[in-house]
């Protein structure tokens, strides 16, 4: 809970500063990259959360990983976090920043699940389907062979399930109802 509040505040401040200085999109790209690095490297997360590792060593690690590769605002945030002994929440801040960025920009996340990778035409069709629900859409593609075919679209609390397994289950339920009612 405490980490969430801290992450929210730092992310909000960074969004405000980046927007004021016209570097919001660059900083968002940086935060996405930072989140990706932390997701892929659990040892990095462990080091950042380890109270035994000194702050200057953590700063050196962050500098080596991101120095010269991210915007000055982003690097300043990372430096500030190590000075304030908040490096343990870098991952949470990057995730929260992206959530707030999407909210600010009116971008909705749409999860599309299929049995195989989708084509550009299909991607455009899925975006068109969701265009009535949101002006800007970010697709997250997932592969799940359990749906047997078709697709499942999820946005917020809405779901469009056009999968083969859902249709088979619907037929099964109708058949079961008819047998019971017979």
From Swiss-Prot:
Pfam families: OSCP. Gene3D superfamilies: N-terminal domain of the delta subunit of the F1F0-ATP synthase (1.10.520.20). InterPro entries: ATP_synth_OSCP/delta_N_sf, ATPase_OSCP/dsu. SUPFAM superfamilies: N-terminal domain of the delta subunit of the F1F0-ATP synthase. It is a peripheral membrane protein. Keywords: ATP synthesis, Cell inner membrane, Cell membrane, CF(1), Hydrogen ion transport, Ion transport, Membrane, Transport. GO terms for cellular component: plasma membrane; proton-transporting ATP synthase complex. It comes from the Bacteria. GO terms for molecular function: proton-transporting ATP synthase activity, rotational mechanism. It is found in: Cell inner membrane. HAMAP family: ATP_synth_delta_bact (MF_01416). F-type ATPases have 2 components, F(1) - the catalytic core - and F(0) - the membrane proton channel. F(1) has five subunits: alpha(3), beta(3), gamma(1), delta(1), epsilon(1). F(0) has three main subunits: a(1), b(2) and c(10-14). The alpha and beta chains form an alternating ring which encloses part of the gamma chain. F(1) is attached to F(0) by a central stalk formed by the gamma and epsilon chains, while a peripheral stalk is formed by the delta and b chains. Belongs to the ATPase delta chain family. PANTHER family: ATP SYNTHASE DELTA CHAIN. F(1)F(0) ATP synthase produces ATP from ADP in the presence of a proton or sodium gradient. F-type ATPases consist of two structural domains, F(1) containing the extramembraneous catalytic core and F(0) containing the membrane proton channel, linked together by a central stalk and a peripheral stalk. During catalysis, ATP synthesis in the catalytic domain of F(1) is coupled via a rotary mechanism of the central stalk subunits to proton translocation. This protein is part of the stalk that links CF(0) to CF(1). It either transmits conformational changes from CF(0) to CF(1) or is implicated in proton conduction. This is ATP synthase subunit delta. It comes from Cytophaga hutchinsonii (strain ATCC 33406 / DSM 1761 / CIP 103989 / NBRC 15051 / NCIMB 9469 / D465). The lineage of its organism: Bacteria, Pseudomonadati, Bacteroidota, Cytophagia, Cytophagales. The gene is atpH.
